[in-house]
């Protein structure tokens, strides 16, 4: 639906500014998640008052084409009629029970049916909770303590995962946040993404002690960096060889890049490819607080109440969240959904690239399904160190120019973007036109 009575964008941000000042007095940094504060790009955060389709309106009634989509969940756009109807119906039956519901079973059935590697799942309330629980389960199932993660991959803010690489190859990591004791991360080995030699050495040195290797198959907190096919294949082979579990963090990519997640994309190039465990979130909740982790029956049956690995949650499987998630999953299974979504997203990236190239501005981008990223670089990076070479001040200028044109990208250089089925060809054209004007004057 095309909104009517759109106000022109103006530099005045009276209500946004006032709300931010009020918030800073009571909420640390004025926000409830750091990236929202615009600290990386400067300026005043936009306080959203409503959203519909591909758009949101801020507190000053300025409209924006939204390429964040709640950081990925809104694959259908905001306020999709079928999802809204499902949530409204669920609300009439009660908000939360602390007891099992039929919708929990239905959602689990859908997830297991759609993701071939899943035999059982456990529902939780956030991606952080899912990743944290998956690691605990991997350790419990294998009887091992050490885990592998990769520099630049984000798996939530659990203590054991807030870690950066140590001082040498195949050394254990150091905390990236105050409040995380060094001993908490002493079992976390941090490797360079897409670095085969480091991967080989880590398993050669520690293979018998490694419980799991956790990886974002497409790293969305490096903007958009794919694990190469040879690298992913070797991850699978080494985990199998040493008895470690391969854990796919698909909180961002699950149902966002393909119906079966990123693992289904890799399975096209690696015959029989499956992770042992998968972490899901975002799209499966349709914008509600809902996530999941799952895997083989043998591993998942180690969870309480069947097994010795404890995990619990008061709001896990919330009836309103599961209604929202089920409605979303049903919509994205309609014929042609991902073909159209992928085509629209590729069109956006191609348009931005062409506009930058025409102006002689270094630029490259990539996408899969409804997820995309771009860099002010000459070629796509393969690891975090290369991502860090992107021109930060230039990105900040781009961000604010697009914002002034009514286009809302992530207010940080290292975050992926998202296209929804609600984005129209006109939205993409308007976005590319705004970018072309910026690049021409850069």
From Swiss-Prot:
User: Is Cytoplasm found in the keyword set?
Assistant: yes
Pathway named in the protein's UniProt entry = Porphyrin-containing compound metabolism; protoporphyrin-IX biosynthesis; 5-aminolevulinate from L-glutamyl-tRNA(Glu): step 2/2
Identify a single GO molecular function assigned to this protein: glutamate-1-semialdehyde 2,1-aminomutase activity
Q: Which GO terms describe its biological process?
A: protoporphyrinogen IX biosynthetic process
Enzyme class, UniProt record, top EC level? isomerase
Task: Give its E.C. classification number.
Answer: 5.4.3.8
Known catalytic reactions: (S)-4-amino-5-oxopentanoate = 5-aminolevulinate
Q: List UniProt keywords, sorted A-Z.
A: Cytoplasm, Isomerase, Porphyrin biosynthesis, Pyridoxal phosphate
List cofactor names only: pyridoxal 5'-phosphate
User: Quick one: signal sequence residues?
Assistant: none
Q: Name one Pfam family in it.
A: Aminotran_3
UniProt-listed Gene3D superfamilies: Aspartate Aminotransferase, domain 1 (3.90.1150.10), Type I PLP-dependent aspartate aminotransferase-like (Major domain) (3.40.640.10)
- Can you supply one Gene Ontology CC term for this chain's record? cytoplasm
Compartments where located: Cytoplasm
* Residue(s) carrying N6-(pyridoxal phosphate)lysine: 282
Main localization, broad class: cytoplasm
How is the subunit organization of this protein annotated in UniProt? Homodimer.
Q: Which family does it belong to?
A: Belongs to the class-III pyridoxal-phosphate-dependent aminotransferase family. HemL subfamily.
This protein is called Glutamate-1-semialdehyde 2,1-aminomutase
Naturally occurring in which organism (per UniProt): Polaromonas sp. (strain JS666 / ATCC BAA-500)
Give me the gene this protein comes from: hemL
């Amino acid at each position: 639906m095309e909104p009517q009575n759109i106000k022109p964008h103006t530099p005045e941000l009276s209500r946004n500014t006032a709300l931010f000042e009020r918030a800073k007095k009571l909420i640390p940094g004025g926000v409830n998640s750091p990236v929202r504060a615009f600290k990386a790009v400067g300026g005043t955060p936009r306080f959203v008052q409503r959203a519909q389709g591909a758009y949101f309106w801020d507190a000053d009634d300025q409209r924006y084409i939204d390429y964040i989509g709640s950081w990925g969940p809104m694959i259908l756009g905001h306020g999709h009629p079928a999802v809204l109807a499902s949530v409204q119906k669920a609300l009439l039956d009660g908000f939360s029970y602390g007891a099992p519901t039929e919708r929990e079973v239905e959602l689990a059935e859908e997830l297991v049916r759609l993701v071939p590697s899943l035999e059982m799942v456990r529902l939780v309330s956030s991606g952080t909770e899912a990743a944290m629980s998956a690691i605990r389960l991997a350790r419990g199932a294998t009887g091992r303590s050490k885990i592998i993660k990769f520099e630049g991959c984000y798996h939530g803010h659990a203590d054991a995962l807030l870690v950066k690489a140590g001082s040498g190859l195949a050394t254990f990591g150091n905390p990236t946040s105050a409040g995380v004791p060094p001993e908490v991360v002493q079992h976390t080995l941090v490797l360079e993404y897409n670095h085969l030699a480091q991967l080989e050495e880590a398993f050669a040195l520690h293979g018998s002690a490694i419980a799991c290797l956790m990886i974002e198959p497409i790293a969305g907190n490096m903007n958009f960096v794919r694990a190469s096919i040879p690298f992913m294949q070797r991850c699978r082979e080494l985990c199998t060889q040493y008895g470690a579990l391969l854990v796919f963090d698909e909180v961002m990519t699950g149902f966002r890049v393909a119906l079966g997640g990123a693992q289904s994309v890799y399975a096209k190039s690696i015959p029989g490819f499956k992770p042992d465990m998968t972490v899901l979130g975002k799209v499966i909740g349709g914008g509600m607080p809902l996530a999941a982790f799952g895997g083989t029956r043998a591993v998942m049956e180690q969870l309480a109440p069947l097994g010795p690995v404890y995990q619990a949650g008061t709001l896990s499987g919330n009836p309103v969240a599961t209604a929202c998630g089920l409605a979303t999953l049903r919509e994205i299974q309609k014929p042609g959904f991902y073909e159209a979504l992928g085509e629209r997203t590729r069109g956006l990236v191609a348009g931005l690239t062409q506009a930058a190239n025409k102006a002689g501005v270094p630029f490259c981008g990539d996408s899969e399904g409804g997820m995309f990223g771009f860099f002010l670089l000459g070629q796509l990076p393969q690891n975090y160190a290369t991502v860090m070479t992107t021109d930060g001040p230039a990105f900040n200028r781009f961000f604010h120019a697009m914002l002034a044109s009514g286009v809302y990208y992530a207010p940080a250089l290292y975050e992926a973007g998202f296209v929804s089925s609600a984005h129209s060809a006109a939205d993409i054209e308007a976005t590319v036109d705004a970018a072309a004007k910026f690049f021409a004057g850069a």
